[in-house]
Amino acid sequence: TTAPTTLALAELSDDGSASYRFYVDGTAAREIAGDDSHVGEGWIFTGGLGLVLPPVANHIAQLVLQRPPTTLALIDINCRPLVITQPDEYRARLNAVVAAADVIKVSDEDLKYLYPELDSMTAAHRLLEGGPKAVVVTAGSSPVEILTPEGSTQVAVPYVDIVDTVGAGDTFCAGFVAWWVQRSTHSEVHRDTLGDLDLVAAAATAGVHASVIAVGRRGADPPYREELSADLWG
């Protein structure tokens, strides 16, 4: 498509948290609907508006469901209630993607939207029962909760003076995937080990440290790998 990309306007509060306004009509998000995309080996990462706005959301969901067996899928649910106009359709699409995913990253706010009648941990277990090998729950500066069929654990979030939270979730996911890709080239770290609680926690730790750097500076400015401690990579 030659249509422009979707526009998001972020407004920062005094504590660095962001609120967003999205401009989607007349953009590529409303036009992409073909089946000519190709997903190679490695990882596929999606979520947020990509699973909210049809027709592109339906197309992306199919990419996740029909990806090659060697391709891992990380889904950052990142609900956008303000632009969800068909909640039943959205939930059905999301449930299908969750069932096909390997790792789900979800915030406490996402869980409140999806399961308003449940507390966060019960809701997270509900997601895990839906099919993924691991669920990672973020809640701002609170410890990250990790759930796999083996059990659960927490990853502490180091203190940081927050400047700008734009891109924090994407940076977390990038750190998670980068750790997994790095380790998979040197050891037996693959899809079957995504249920290993210690390994998932180690990958989440890399994600946490990456996102802490990102929120400590202005703009969506994730760190380079050399900015992270070498100890994170094992």
Report the location of each language-model feature.
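Short gly/ser/thr-rich secondary-structure transition/capping motifs
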Residues: 24-33, 83-89, 192-193
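Conserved N-terminal subdomain of the carbohydrate kinase-like
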Residues: 1-48, 53, 230-234
